[in-house]
Amino acid sequence: MSLFHLILVALIQGITEFLPVSSSGHLILLPALTGLEDQGQVIDVAVHVGTLGAVVLYFWRDVRDGLAGLPRALTGRLDTPGARLAMGLIVATIPTVLAGAALHFTGLSDALRSITVIGWTMLLFGLLLWWADRTGAQVKEATDWSLRDALILGLWQAVALIPGTSRSGITITGARAMGYTRSDGARISMLMSIPTIIASGVLLGADVAVTSDAQAARDGAIAAAFAFVSALLALSLMMRLLRSVSFTPYVIYRLALGLVLLGIAYS
């Protein structure tokens, strides 16, 4: 795998992981449209580690509070904001873990990796994001996040296992439909990504430890570094823009890319 290809994969993952445009969809499209080889599990795990580091650093106060409240959450004592956050993230992650394991072990995840599927999901879920952002009230904040809302958003998040859906896009859509502000809906979505990325990395990396070599480890370190920097920049820019800009630019991008992909798929 060339250095150019390595950096390209890392940048695509880093930039698109937290934007509502589907990182997995873009990574599937890269070899399909360019003829480049698939990056493999080592690089997949590495870029996940990089993006995980970015979101943890950006939301480090929330992460600190959640970790501090985790012991209380595990014993059912939801009497602090940190404990409620930790329990909310646990509840929100369960549907995705169960659905992801089912798709992985049945082989259905591979069947969904096609340009046609990505094209349709880009279009359909882009329109759904536009509808939710246009019609959803902005009356709820992150402090209003309940276990009921966590479960609902967890079910939305499980849908993102279909390539092209976008994990951040579908959870932000759900949050906006439930009346969360753009900034707080995105904040909840980003925090939900942390246990999800960890679970995904564990699943992808099950065999990496015994199959990787020194070269693979070096490639992984490079990929993780570039993914970390690009993800942190993209996340910072998006959260800043959401103070004054809607999700319409991302919707337009999704619709344009979806139409191009369907044109390729059906030509």
Swiss-Prot record:
Pfam families per UniProt: BacA
Localization per Swiss-Prot or TrEMBL: Cell inner membrane
Coiled-coil stretches noted in the UniProt entry, renumbered to this chain: none
Gene Ontology MF term list: undecaprenyl-diphosphatase activity
Gene Ontology CC terms, in alphabetical order: plasma membrane
One GO-annotated biological process of the protein: response to antibiotic
Superkingdom of origin organism: Bacteria
Membrane-spanning intervals of the chain: 1-21, 40-60, 85-105, 111-131, 190-210, 219-239, 245-265
Known function: Catalyzes the dephosphorylation of undecaprenyl diphosphate (UPP). Confers resistance to bacitracin.
Miscellaneous comment as given in the Swiss-Prot or TrEMBL entry: Bacitracin is thought to be involved in the inhibition of peptidoglycan synthesis by sequestering undecaprenyl diphosphate, thereby reducing the pool of lipid carrier available.
Protein known as: Undecaprenyl-diphosphatase
